[in-house]
Amino acid sequence: MAQFGGQKNPPWATQFTATAVSQPAALGVQQPSLLGASPTIYTQQTALAAAGLTTQTPANYQLTQTAALQQQAAAVLQQQYSQPQQALYSVQQQLQQPQQTILTQPAVALPTSLSLSTPQPAAQITVSYPTPRSSQQQTQPQKQRVFTGVVTKLHDTFGFVDEDVFFQLGAVKGKTPQVGDRVLVEATYNPNMPFKWNAQRIQTLPNQNQSQTQPLLKTPTAVIQPIVPQTTFGVQAQPQPQSLLQAQISAASITPLLQTQPQPLLQQPQQKAGLLQPPVRIVSQPQPARRLDPPSRFSGRNDRGDQVPNRKDDRSRERDRERRRSRERSPQRKRSRERSPRRERERSPRRVRRVVPRYTVQFSKFSLDCPSCDMMELRRRYQNLYIPSDFFDAQFTWVDAFPLSRPFQLGNYCNFYVMHREVESLEKNMAVLDPPDADHLYSAKVMLMASPSMEDLYHKSCALAEDPQDLRDGFQHPARLVKFLVGMKGKDEAMAIGGHWSPSLDGPNPEKDPSVLIKTAIRCCKALTGIDLSVCTQWYRFAEIRYHRPEETHKGRTVPAHVETVVLFFPDVWHCLPTRSEWETLSRGYKQQLVEKLQGERKKADGEQDEEEKDDGEVKEIATPTHWSKLDPKAMKVNDLRKELESRALSSKGLKSQLIARLTKQLKIEEQKEEQKELEKSEKEEEDEDDKKSEDDKEEEERKRQEEVERQRQERRYILPDEPAIIVHPNWAAKSGKFDCSIMSLSVLLDYRLEDNKEHSFEVSLFAELFNEMLQRDFGVRIYKSLLSLPEKEDKKDKEKKSKKEERKDKKEEREDDIDEPKPKRRKSGDDKDKKEDRDERKKEEKRKDDSKDDDETEEDNNQDEYDPMEAEEAEDEDDDREEEEVKRDDKRDVSRYCKDRPAKDKEKEKPQMVTVNRDLLMAFVYFDQSHCGYLLEKDLEEILYTLGLHLSRAQVKKLLNKVVLRESCFYRKLTDTSKDDENHEESEALQEDMLGNRLLLPTPTIKQESKDGEENVGLIVYNGAMVDVGSLLQKLEKSEKVRAEVEQKLQLLEEKTDEDGKTILNLENSNKSLSGELREVKKDLGQLQENLEVSENMNLQFENQLNKTLRNLSTVMDDIHTVLKKDNVKSEDRDEKSKENGSGV
């Protein structure tokens, strides 16, 4: 990527329109500042004075008649929109017609604040082929710019302008700028420098205090403002008689400018700080500018960009101004039909319009049956394609490989999986890429396609009617789903996989024997990617590219001038896809390789650790001194004394007595130190142990985490995905160690640029264009076949009229039967309700009309881009049903009564469930309708039919289009979708002769007929003494492949089902175990409850017995008490009798 987001120029260097580019007139040019003056005091004289024009010498300074008209129009518009507080520009002198018309003048750089403000048209979108090739040599980026910018950074010796342009303080002329100052910059571009744009001169613009003021009025779009000439630094440029406007202005160009309405006064575009902007040059013809990167082909874009909304806003603002003016001119009066506040509140909300996607249709606008192409034809077709200097011819052999009778079939599932460079292949690759006898006369290259299955293509790109809404909203263009395996040389250089022909390895005579170059392709593909293409059964020769190579020296030998032919093959690589069982075997092999690698790394790490420990132990043995308590210096030998002194880093020289004294002194010092350390050690031992443990734990955790991350990274590289794919092992040593492989979609390959100026990138881009054209032709032919099979539109109308007449007759008969029957009693009340409902509906319609008046005014001026074909279709249906409205009004009461009886059935009829029955036709339309608008315009569909190479006439195409076109649009969903009730869809196949259009009517050479007659018997070959029909074998092979794919799919479904059943069985077993455990617990609890019951029953019996015993004892006690009481009563009675007797006796 370049420094500025993929472009070589910074943002300020690419702000040019299609007819306006920035180019300095000369080096060292200074633009006079207009910042010092206020917009309120500008006049035409001051503007002319700023431009270097005065009225003292009118003979030398005269404008053309068209310029005078522009100045007068500016004065009129400015007076019309004048305000009381603002002074506008005024024309104070009459300009005369010049004596000589200026035809060719150099362009003048205008500040954008004073230049035209006409809205710039958006880039037109066709097939997104870029600028014409004729201007490629002139579209190189300009090396020098003169502009104004703001200082964003400033250091001691250098600074930056607009964050992109580097300047040194030595390049500053005059006053040193500060951060935020506006400066005039002269910069040059150098791609070899760290900062691509370097300023040669910097000059601070004066009047910085007024640079932040905003203009009070916007300059009208139709006025060309006075021109400010550029001057050199410090020197005022002398005006010249023939360089007043420095632009070619014609009378034809002034007419639309004068007719353009001015912009509103109070709406100002938001400007940056200051009035001066990067200059814009006005020229009569497009000047060479740097080509911007083309937008993606398969993105949602419109042909006219945002012009329509701008025009619509202009019209609405113009109407608002006209209404305000009429209100200001007319006196205040009471409206005769003033709306009441209640009515204002009761107004129904404005109807929300359905959001229609932007119409985007792209296709190649040339005949797609061209078998060859030269330099000029390539330029005309692909204006964005870089063409190598040695190229001179290309043969498009795909036209013969995929004729109209046998087109290419999408939907063959295939995918690639690129392995990491550290992962080695399970099988050793013995293929040779560059043999010593490699001959550059022929090269064979392959383009390997990866594609989803047909069902996935339908669901992901077509938005089928039966799909859920979220899946329909996430559609993708088929060109994004079809992908190719390409080689990558460097960072962004795509290349086709292949190499040069070798006579010793591939065989001789490649021009006669087609199998020679196929062997070359197999060998080179095996060497570069590890893919064995020998399994492929069909090799389609897609294109041949020829280069004229001059004489050169290759590997020390001189190669004469020759023609190199590059053949691009398109094999059926999906036959190389491993089966499910083979894929499982490969997955186990790579897992085993991962285990072996991890074990080898672990052993290696353990061996290194043991060696380090051994080395450390030896060093410790040598360097560790003996403890002082174990030494007796007087009894030691001289050598032992010297070793101990050396281990303690002391001098070992001298006599024995000196050595003894030196060692004794050192031992005493060690003894004292050790005593001190023992005291301190006892205090710090506990703290050190805790710290060591925590540090060791942290190191261990960090080591384990790193090992786990490394293990997961290794597993991601070695573990294969679930779905089978062709494994790719790029040869990292090829192409000077810069080779890699990538899977890129067709849309990405089509989005090439002129900067892709490599020969191998040219081949890939050309193949992408040819493959896209092949798909366009096949899908276009599919549309053509469907149009042929449709009946004429008149037959449809007749059938519809007959069915309508029959329905009317049935309704009339039913109505007569209802009249004969007795009327219900409450019919009158029902009629009254119907009348009330009619009145309410009329009131609502009036309200809707009042609310939609403004919308109707805006919609009257809409052009074809604002035309909604879906609404047009509804309106057409309403016109067709207008005749039935009278009958419906008469039968309204009967229908309403009928609806009350059967409301559910009517609802079902109103919203039928749609189903896509013709998926192939839907995909054909969707390939062109990239934004899924649901329709194709008649002009686009007509051009698509012309590009098919069927040589159809306009009358034939018009007749076909009349079958399906409604108001200049073809709604293809009516052809592909139907309700579930009418799901039985039968297609009438057209004759084979009609499929070829008018090609059979063209004169054919006799040579081709003879070759065709000879080719009829090519399908029969002799093999082992028997005649073999290759065509039938291929058909059987295709059938067997389809059966195999279906069997594998069913097997996969069964495996998935088996896995699900295994999971359910496991869940059932787990639940059974849990239930059995619960059952055991319940039984245990039951046993305990039974034991408790027995204990409680025993206790109950004991209590009952005790209670009975207690009752018996109590009864005996009561009896005893009663007997005792009786005895006492008898004794008391006896005493009473005795006392009575004694009393009577006394």
UniProtKB/Swiss-Prot annotation:
Cysteine disulfide partners in this protein: none
Subunit note: Directly interacts with ESR1, NR3C1 and p53/TP53. Interacts (via N-terminus) with CALCOCO1. Interacts with MED1 and GATA1. Interacts with AR and GATA2.
Record GO biological process: apoptotic process; positive regulation of apoptotic process; positive regulation of cell migration; positive regulation of cell population proliferation
Alphabetical keyword list: Activator, Apoptosis, Cell cycle, Coiled coil, Cytoplasm, Isopeptide bond, Phosphoprotein, Repressor, Transcription, Transcription regulation, Ubl conjugation
Sequence segments annotated as region (Interaction with AR): 1-246
GO molecular function: RNA polymerase II cis-regulatory region sequence-specific DNA binding; transcription coactivator activity; transcription corepressor activity
Modified residue annotations for Phosphothreonine: T624, T664, T858
Region (Interaction with GATA1): 640-1146
Comp. bias (Basic and acidic residues): 290-331, 338-349, 671-684, 691-716, 793-814, 829-852, 885-912
Function, in words: Associates with components of the Mediator and p160 coactivator complexes that play a role as intermediaries transducing regulatory signals from upstream transcriptional activator proteins to basal transcription machinery at the core promoter. Recruited to endogenous nuclear receptor target genes in response to the appropriate hormone. Also functions as a p53 coactivator. May thus play an important role in transcriptional regulation. May be involved in apoptosis signaling in the presence of the retinoid CD437.
GO cellular component annotations of the record: nuclear envelope lumen; perinuclear region of cytoplasm
Region (Disordered): 282-351, 599-635, 671-716, 793-912
Keyword GTP-binding: no
Domain annotation SAP: ranges: 633-667
SUPFAM superfamilies to which the protein is assigned, alphabetical: EF-hand, SAP domain
Protein name stated in the entry: Cell division cycle and apoptosis regulator protein 1
Biased composition (Acidic residues): 608-618, 853-884
